[in-house]
Amino acid sequence: MSLDKSKHEKYVQILREELVPALGCTEPIAIAYTAANLRKIMGGIPDEILIESSGNIIKNAKSVIVPNTGGMKGMEASALIGLIGGNADKGLEVLADVTEEHVKLAHEYLAKSCTKLKLMDTPASLHIRITGKLNGDTGVAELIHQHTNIVLLKKNDEIIFEKPFSLESAAGALTDRTCLNVKDILDFADTVPVDEVSPIIMRQVEYNMRVSEDGLKTSYGIETGKNILKYNQKKGDDFSVKVQAEGEVAAASDARMCGCSYPVITNSGSGNQGLAVSVPVVVYARENKISEEKLIRCLIVSNLLAIHQKTGIGRLSAYCGAVTAGAACAAAITYMKGGSYEQVCGTIVNTLGTVSGILCDGAKQSCAAKIASALDSALFSHELAMDGNFFAGGDGIVKDDIEKTIAGIGVVAAQGMHKTDEVVLQVMLKD
């Protein structure tokens, strides 16, 4: 059954808002983007820089390589390369034009120790404020809730740009996600004219599979993706599409976490989650000779189910997004194979009832292994669901209704794991 026009338009707009290109891990890129905006109002590179951010930004920017920098890591590097070589007009591809000269200059500024870091006292999990001083002038650029949501640009006492925001809530910055539910997502995927969403979805296929291919042919980190295939995959009659999917998506994350210069298409503000909801679906479609139209409809399911789950959790938390992305991806594969609404719900429930609670301890090499592990459990959950085996309401956090289960996970992640998030950051920052 088709959705009403208003909800249909919202679903298309949500896909447009969430499936966007990003070059590099989105938290250090958000720092670089904020810094690039600061340079625009300062007219040059500040001599002194104060980088203030929420704990989750510190967590996710600490260990991941910033793209196009030759291996630079950390918040200072992210801010400096954004100030020196960033192009704020390119959004999450802010570092696309960085050159070797920019990187050399960033190292020189790092050597001057001109940057300071400060943990912000803020209820927002995604919050960045960068203050710079140059020739007696002071500039401020501030971003909150979404990775390109600049809310303040100020030079001395002059407000150059400002928009209202709430520290506690991201409501209003994007299309209201509360319209999402599993049944309507499936109805939308069944009925939306493919031409209406094809440019959005097929760009995700093109970008994310290119990164996966790069991860398989290039040495990145500990080569999780390559090694999954090396240790587990066999040719001929023993070929496993499940292992292939896990290897290809892990390889994509290997590349992304270790400085790959190709952009990916995100989901819920995360490149890794964008990879996790798309690459395995493409692999299953390829191996099962699924048509492009059906692939597009399956990727609609995967993307929107992931966004739906993340709505209650929030963009950044101590709850690893590989779990929700894996559940969404496996549910889309259930849909691909003709599974019913009950079987799609069962896939999600089985996954959330099994691997919920995997910690997010920041963006780094092991994200690839977490994605593969979550996907492995999710694909087993898919197999169980296809045979009619589902966890029942009352089994731990599982409720008797899919929407209640998803809402409960949101409460666990956003409220229950708040203290966990603080302790994880403390452990990460302690020698």
UniProtKB/Swiss-Prot annotation:
Gene Ontology terms describing biological process: L-cysteine catabolic process to pyruvate
Domain of life: Bacteria
InterPro entries with a match to the protein in the record: Ser_deHydtase-like_asu, UPF0597
GO molecular-function terms, A-Z: L-cysteine desulfhydrase activity
Positions of transmembrane segments: none
UniProt similarity note: Belongs to the UPF0597 family.
Protein name: UPF0597 protein TDE_2144
Organism listed in the record: Treponema denticola (strain ATCC 35405 / DSM 14222 / CIP 103919 / JCM 8153 / KCTC 15104)
Phylogenetic placement of the source organism: Bacteria, Pseudomonadati, Spirochaetota, Spirochaetia, Spirochaetales
